[in-house]
């Protein structure tokens, strides 16, 4: 009788846990809606973005965009539920202001971490920092990346105030036409 009760209890627990699903990103991480990038938080500079980046609207080079040849590699972010990339966001030294955001329809499974702001967010506002002679090259890099519930091709939106573009990005999984990320 004891074994039957234990099996029944286990079956009920499994059934109930299957209904709960994976929590929304807001339930796991302290995510802000929109954060301004601090110009002083530049981590590096480069002569030009690598071929792994796609230049969007002339204001930002995005890693792993569908127009690049390979998706970004991810690593486990929290012991099992989320995967993260570690890739710089590259902007022109002295470039124009822009907004990079996660569309609302994917905010349950995608968010931005850091990229010049610290913490987690769904939108970053880059103010168009003044050109700094402190940086040797023409492009500045903000450290950070993207975090997804599971590897997939996800959308980001880039807006420069006059135009808005939806960009598909391979995060741990390729977008159509891309190679898978490196192992």
Regions found by a protein language model. Give the residues of each.
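C-terminal motif of bacterial Sec signal peptides marking the signal peptidase cleavage site
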Residues: 16-18
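Bacterial N-terminal signal peptides that target proteins for export
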Residues: 1-8
């Amino acid at each position: 009788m004891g074994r039957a009760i234990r099996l029944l209890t286990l079956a009920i627990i499994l059934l109930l846990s299957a209904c709960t699903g994976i929590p929304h990103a807001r339930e796991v991480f302290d995510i802000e809606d929109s954060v301004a990038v601090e110009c002083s938080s530049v981590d590096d500079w480069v002569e030009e973005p690598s071929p792994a980046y796609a230049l969007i609207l002339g204001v930002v080079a995005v890693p792993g965009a569908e127009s690049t040849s390979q998706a970004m590699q991810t690593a486990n972010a929290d012991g099992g539920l989320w995967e993260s990339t570690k890739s710089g966001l590259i902007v022109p030294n002295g470039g124009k202001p822009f907004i990079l955001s996660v569309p609302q329809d994917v905010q349950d499974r995608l968010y931005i971490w850091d990229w010049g702001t610290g913490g987690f967010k769904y939108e970053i506002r880059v103010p168009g920092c003044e050109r700094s002679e402190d940086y040797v090259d023409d492009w500045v890099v903000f450290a950070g990346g993207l975090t997804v519930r599971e590897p997939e091709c996800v959308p980001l939106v880039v807006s420069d105030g006059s135009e808005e573009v939806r960009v598909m990005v391979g995060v741990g999984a390729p977008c159509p036409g891309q190679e898978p990320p490196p192992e």
